[in-house]
Amino acid sequence: MNTQSAQKQRGVALLVVLILLVMMSALAAKIGQQFCRNLQKTRYQVSQQQLRWAMQGQAAAIKDRLQTDASGESNGLSPEGAWHEPLETQGENYTVVSQIEDAQTCFNVNSLLAIDPAPPADSAAVQPTKPVKEQIVEQLLIDSGISTAAAEEVYQQLVDYLDADSTTAKEALESDAWAGVTPQRLPANQMMRTISEIKRLPGFPVAAYPRASKVLCALPDTESKVDVNTLKPGQAPLLSALSAGTLSEDDAARLIASRPEEGWASVDAFSKTLETNYPQSKAILAQMQAFVAVNSHYFRVESTGNTDDLTLRVVSQIHVDRDSGEVRTWQRRYRMIE
């Protein structure tokens, strides 16, 4: 009996040892996995910080370019000037490439908060039945694939979203008009920070956003001046809408393609080209001049940084003060790709 008892005790002891070994192995594996995750996380954080420092290091060069080419009100912005050349920084384990783009190649929806410019006193053109900005926005929405009726509805919702009051254009409460929206939300009653906010409007079809976001934007300003010197032929619908349809999209594309290599020197030079080549635009010329410019004060810097571990993309929105030339970043968005 003593022998059998001893054997049982040895068996139990062996079983306990095996259980402890299994538990220790599982714990060691878990510790190893956690260590690898922490190590990888640390490498990502170091790489991300390294790329951010490199991007911040490019800020001075970007500032110099914009102050040289974009400051001032009278000079036209050359489409392919030094400001538009890619800026590349290479380090021991990373590469950062930044591209400056003109952010005034779209209609600023926040300008709907300002009163429409008054028509010239000597204008012989027939006065429109709708405000000019309303016509422009609705036409751009229609060009984005939205029906005429839906475009009118979206425009009214957009105005309600931006203005500070709590009533709609039809004197109803905005809270009632937005009551059936899911998920529940109310108009912001302030400027849009990004044009993606337009997707929050109840009547806006999300499928139209890819096209609408190319011609509409949200700048922190109540003015909307489209820089005709940096428009591309694919943005002809925007120029056509600014002309209240006087220029067809094909005409607008040809006008953009015929732009001088260094861009138009002034709005008057642009207007002269427009009137000479498209005489039908004469009646709308004075109205159109209120919405076009040959330079820009808002820019977008698209930076891409690469290391062995990750890719970091940063989009910075920049404003250049037209008087002092001060360059200020008013928005920055990060996106990390592992």
Question: What kind of feature is each model-predicted range?
Answer:
Residues 2-338:
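Compositionally biased linear targeting/interaction segments
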